[in-house]
Amino acid sequence: MFTKGGLGNLMKQAQQMQEKMAKIQEEIAQMEVTGEAGAGLVKVTINGAHNCRRVEVDPSLLQDDKDMLEDLAAAAFNDATRRISEVQKKKMSAISTGMQLPNGFNMPV
C-alpha cells in the first residue's frame, strides 16, 4: 500500500500542513472585518472568532424606526460574518495547494 519512504513523506507533509493551519488560524483569530448595511449607516466589526468587537450606528438612524435599526444591525453582522468566512476559506485553501487530496476532501475552516 505505502512504501516506507512514501508513508514517511506523507506524515511529514501532514505535520507541515498542521503547522501551517495553526499559524493561519492564529492569524485569522487576530483579524477584524467590518460588515455594513444600509449603505454604511450601520457597521458591525467582528474578529476571526466571529465575536462582535464594535457596532457603529449613524446618528440619523436614532430618530427612525427601531425595527429598521434592528434589521440593519443584523444585516451588518451577517455581512461581517460572510466576509470573515471568505477570508478563512481563502487562507485555508492556500494550505492545500499542491497537495494530492482525495476527491471530496475539504480542509476544515
UniProtKB/Swiss-Prot annotation:
Subcellular location: Cytoplasm, Nucleoid
Domain of life: Bacteria
Stored Pfam families: YbaB_DNA_bd
Primary location recorded for the protein, binned into one broad class: cytoplasm
Gene3D superfamilies tied to this protein: Nucleoid-associated protein YbaB-like domain (3.30.1310.10)
GO molecular function: DNA binding
GO annotation, cellular component aspect: bacterial nucleoid; cytosol
Keywords, alphabetical: Cytoplasm, DNA-binding
Coiled-coil ranges (or none): none
Family per record: Belongs to the YbaB/EbfC family.
Function description: Binds to DNA and alters its conformation. May be involved in regulation of gene expression, nucleoid organization and DNA protection.
Quaternary context: Homodimer.
HAMAP family: DNA_YbaB_EbfC (MF_00274)
PANTHER family (UniProt xref): NUCLEOID-ASSOCIATED PROTEIN YBAB
NCBIfam families, sorted: DNA_YbaB_EbfC
Protein name according to UniProt: Nucleoid-associated protein BU482
Species this chain originates from: Buchnera aphidicola subsp. Acyrthosiphon pisum (strain APS) (Acyrthosiphon pisum symbiotic bacterium)
